[in-house]
Amino acid sequence: MTEHNVRNFNINFGPQHPAAHGVLRLVLELDGEIVERVDPHIGLLHRGTEKLIETKTYLQAVPYFDRLDYVAPMNQEHAYALAVEKLLGIEIPIRGQLIRVLYSEIGRILSHLLNVTTQAMDVGALTPPLWGFEEREKLMVFYERASGSRMHAAYVRPGGVHQDLPEQLVQDIGDWCDPFLKALDDIDNLLTGNRIFKQRNVDIGVVSLEDCWAWGFSGVMVRGSGAAWDLRRSQPYECYSDLEFDIPIGKNGDNYDRYLIRMIEMRQSVRIMKQCVNRLLSDAKTGPFSSIDGKVVPPKRGEMKRSMEALIHHFKLYTEGYHVPAGEVYAAVEAPKGEFGVYLVSDGSNKPYRCKIRAPGYAHLQAMDFMCRGHQLADVAAVLGSLDIVFGEVDR
């Protein structure tokens, strides 16, 4: 009897793989079709964001946040703006808060639509992405009408938002809500009961709640395993405490539960958007949309044409920028992918001394090895799809 040396088979998944969602490289160790080890290689989209922010004024740092999770840009700006406002100790008027929340929920729908439909595409369903992108296109137009840009908005700034929303735009967002729910029903009918979709996702990538906390998960990943942890509820910011919405939680902690939670969250986001639209058209129809602290928010164009002081002030704010009191602060928002946090250290100058970005996708990608071990090779793509990973924020 001869002895055979059996060694496992190594393959590279990515960086140009269509299911890799960007520039991920996974080194997979396979025993036949069973995955023995998953080794994610990241850093292929590293741009040194945290270091670059240290060389810019507080206002100039805002656009860097759009480029992290680039499928829901305003949610990141929101966390940064909250951190700077905490250090400055300024309050945002209610109209500004409502606009921020409205656009944060639009970002959540943008992200979940992309994720749910591409997760379906990863397991072979080709129709949902076409339907999802049709709705995303309409939302991108709302982004553009608010900020002038479809993706990199730089709209949520420390002190409020950049410009007020026209009344017509608010009405159009309100009109978009109900037809969208019908489109969501179509995707729901196609996927939720689909036998093939369920076979590829049920009991795949199961994570228990204890493991979730141990791996540092947040957002949908934790809620899929049964914890009702949502920063909009547990640590309310802006005007979330005044709004009505439900937090869906799963019980199995598998890919399918996470898919269902994202579907329900989109409906809850529409519910929040409707409440914001109603208030923006009634009690918060007029009034300031950004802080009235003139030391942070630049003066209006009309004022600059009348007053020399306003012109000087505007020039100073855009060249030197405002000085933020020394201190350190952590602000987090419930981004579509999980808890997006900004840890900001100020030394009292006009530039951040250090800005640490806590990206949710980074913690989730760490657990790829833990979640895929023992599964089939084909399940790696399904697990990766349900983690909802965008490389801008993982590599920063």
Swiss-Prot record:
It comes from the Bacteria. InterPro entries: NADH_Q_OxRdtase_suD (IPR001135), NADH_UbQ_OxRdtase_49kDa_CS (IPR014029), NDH1_su_D/H (IPR022885), NiFe-Hase_large (IPR029014). It is an enzyme of class 7 (translocase). GO terms for molecular function: NAD binding; NADH:ubiquinone reductase (non-electrogenic) activity; quinone binding. Its main location: membrane. It holds the Pfam family Complex1_49kDa. One of its GO terms (cellular component) is plasma membrane. NDH-1 shuttles electrons from NADH, via FMN and iron-sulfur (Fe-S) centers, to quinones in the respiratory chain. The immediate electron acceptor for the enzyme in this species is believed to be ubiquinone. Couples the redox reaction to proton translocation (for every two electrons transferred, four hydrogen ions are translocated across the cytoplasmic membrane), and thus conserves the redox energy in a proton gradient. This is NADH-quinone oxidoreductase subunit D. It comes from Rhizobium leguminosarum bv. trifolii (strain WSM2304).
